[in-house]
Design a protein with these regions (language model features):
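Polytopic transmembrane helical bundles with strong interfacial aromatic enrichment
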Residues: 1-313
Length: 313
């Protein structure tokens, strides 16, 4: 039961941090500087989304620290004892890392509670989110290697995580924008959604290429050329295959959006024809893509608890 609780905490802290980073970044490039910018900023949902992401990641980070404390000490009740928690925080690397995450996320929450909505706020949130996301590389399998190999593996991990944050963090606000556009049925909201989708399409290709490249590097370190057959015979390998299948499905949906559905919406907006059919098609596609992304995060949380094939060498 405790292992499942720790796994759930890992999933939630990953999801919250990825959304905090990626969504803050999306608000900076997705809303742009045009005449609709002021209206986009004044809307309450971007601020609320970031606050929810911070609170979820902060609570999950605390729960993860408590769960690891209970697991290492062998006593569930030690999770609530300050002496046990402080010992884990001061005496272990992952404990210090967890405490730093809690500190950064607490600062992010305080800034959001001040309710100063601006590009400066989003820049700060993206920066703090990037720190939290990158820190996961130091508590994952990237910490297994030392020397130059360790630097390369950890660096690849950091870039992989940040690229995932850019993608996943954009999907949530895009889904919300599409839902708002359908609910309002106004051409202005449809144009806002279309503009954001166009901007994300330009970023998406770079993100996918980065994920593929860093994924290959990470697999080289964790599986190795001599053990690639073990991806079908080990728990880690099978979980990795599931992740790759989910990732492939996300790429198919992303390509459909970029080359078919977004151009259809753009044509509707330009020609002043009905935009609702195109918006509904995009809503369905982006929401499914978001659901797949959540499943990927769950698999990543699981992979962090499993021994990779290279650990058997």
């Amino acid at each position: 039961m405790l292992d499942w609780a720790i796994l759930g905490a890992r999933l939630l802290q990953y999801a919250g941090a990825l959304i905090l980073f990626g969504s803050s970044l999306f608000f900076l490039y997705g809303f742009g500087e045009g005449p609709h910018y002021a209206a986009d900023v004044r809307r309450p949902w971007p601020h609320s989304l970031l606050l929810i992401a911070v609170v979820v990641s902060l609570a999950a980070s605390l729960a993860w620290l408590m769960g690891e404390t209970a697991s290492l000490t062998g006593e569930t009740r030690n999770a609530i004892y300050w002496t046990s928690l402080s010992s884990i925080v001061t005496d272990t690397g992952f404990g210090r890392l967890g405490a730093m995450r809690v500190g950064v996320l607490s600062c992010a929450a305080i800034l959001l509670l001040a309710r100063q909505v601006s590009r400066g706020q989003w820049t700060l949130q993206a920066t703090m989110g990037a720190f939290v996301v990158a820190s996961f590389a130091w508590s994952g399998h990237g910490s297994m290697d030392s020397g130059r190999a360790g630097l390369l593996h950890r660096g690849s991990d950091v870039v992989h995580l940040l690229a995932a944050g850019v993608w996943i963090g954009a999907l949530v606000p895009l889904s919300l924008q599409l839902l708002r556009s359908i609910a309002s049925r106004t051409r202005a909201d449809a144009a806002v959604a279309e503009r954001s989708l166009e901007r994300f399409s330009g970023v998406g290709a770079t993100v996918v290429a980065t994920l593929i490249l860093t994924g290959i590097v990470n697999s080289w370190f964790l599986i190795g050329p001599a053990r690639w057959r073990e991806i079908f015979t080990t728990p880690y390998g099978r979980a990795l295959v599931v992740k790759l299948i989910l990732f492939a499905l996300m790429m198919i949906l992303a390509a459909t959006n970029r080359y078919r559905l977004v151009p259809a919406l753009s044509a509707s907006v330009t020609a002043s024809s009905p935009t609702l059919p195109a918006l509904k098609a995009l809503r369905q596609s982006v929401c499914v893509e978001t659901a797949l992304a959540i499943l990927v995060i769950g698999v990543v949380a699981l992979l962090g608890t499993l021994a990779p094939p290279v650990s058997n060498d």
